[in-house]
UniProtKB/Swiss-Prot annotation:
Pfam families: DegV (PF02645). The lineage of its organism: Bacteria, Bacillati, Bacillota, Bacilli, Bacillales. One of its GO terms (molecular function) is lipid binding. It comes from Staphylococcus aureus (strain MW2). PANTHER family: DEGV DOMAIN-CONTAINING PROTEIN DR_1986-RELATED, DEGV DOMAIN-CONTAINING PROTEIN SPR1019. This is DegV domain-containing protein MW1315.
Length: 279
């Protein structure tokens, strides 16, 4: 049977230990801080990146160069292995499109998948992909199963600082100033892989209550398999959220990590990314 190799980027919020233990090849995004370039999760950690945001430094993220994908695909596929390359949503980054272009320029057998998500929304798809590869499922069938899994995943983002949204052009300076004065915390979700702001909360507690309501509506009669929480240096907020969700949904499985710089660069210090995987 043909060997299958998994490739992804640095935005899944899965631990380095998990990625290494399952032989997942990571092609990282790049970060620019005050004009200096860093390789995500290689030259700088998520925690260190958030420190720069807290200091209100100019931060940007950029997708990997196409040459990095070409080199990886050629090396990994030279023995005839199939490559399954899964990446953060094409609605948030050009990474998927670059990976796809690279796949068309090499002789290797590469299938590129748009996860339509990020953070643990991508991470849970990778975990499922790992299990499917172990079971010997064909690549074409894997694509179908991941499409189905995506229907059971919902991602929310609670914005920490409006400054990052202003810098990114998502809201005007005037709206941002008013929002900061009123301490508004916008909440967004992914709609077909694109971030849409759907609610404005005034406090942490009100944001948690809104998320509880939305999650209850999303899961319906289903149980929750896992909740992933990626935070930008606000573990107290995460603890509050867990307490409410434990009472409401009897959740046993949480995955918690500091969020990927691709999220924190746009949402600021104090943000969380919440991903629900229902059974």
């Amino acid at each position: 049977m043909t060997k299958q190799i998994i490739v992804t980027d640095s935005t899944s919020d899965l631990s380095k230990e998990y990625l290494e233990a399952n032989n997942i090849h990571v092609i990282p995004l790049s970060l620019t801080i005050e004009g200096a370039s860093y390789v995500d999760q290689v030259d700088i950690t998520s925690e260190e990146f958030i420190n720069h945001i807290e200091n209100d430094e100019d931060v940007k993220t950029s997708q990997p160069a196409i040459g990095e994908f070409i080199s990886a695909y050629e090396e990994l596929g030279k023995d005839g292995s199939e490559i399954i390359s899964i990446h953060l949503s094409s609605g948030l980054s050009g990474t998927y499109n670059t990976a796809y272009q690279a796949s068309q320029m090499v002789d290797a057998n590469v299938t590129v998948i748009d996860s339509k998500s990020i953070s643990f929304g991508l991470g849970y798809q990778i975990q499922h992909l790992v299990e499917l590869v172990k079971e010997g499922v064909s690549t074409s069938e894997i694509v179908k199963k991941l499409n189905h899994l995506r229907e059971n995943i919902k991602l929310f983002v609670v914005i920490g600082q409006l400054n990052q949204l202003i810098k990114g052009g998502r809201i005007s300076k005037t709206k941002g100033l008013i929002g900061n004065l009123m301490k508004i915390k916008p909440i967004g979700t992914l709609d077909d892989g694109r971030l849409e702001l759907v609610h404005n909360a005034r406090t942490q507690n009100s944001s948690i209550q809104y998320l509880k309501k939305e999650i209850a509506e999303f899961i319906g009669d289903h149980e929750i398999k896992s909740i992933g929480v990626a935070h930008a240096n606000v573990i107290e907020y995460v603890d509050k959220l867990k307490k409410v969700f434990n009472e409401a949904f009897h959740v046993n499985n949480y995955d918690i990590n500091v969020t990927t710089p691709v999220i924190s660069a746009h949402t600021g210090q104090g943000a969380i990314g919440l991903v629900v995987l229902k059974k």
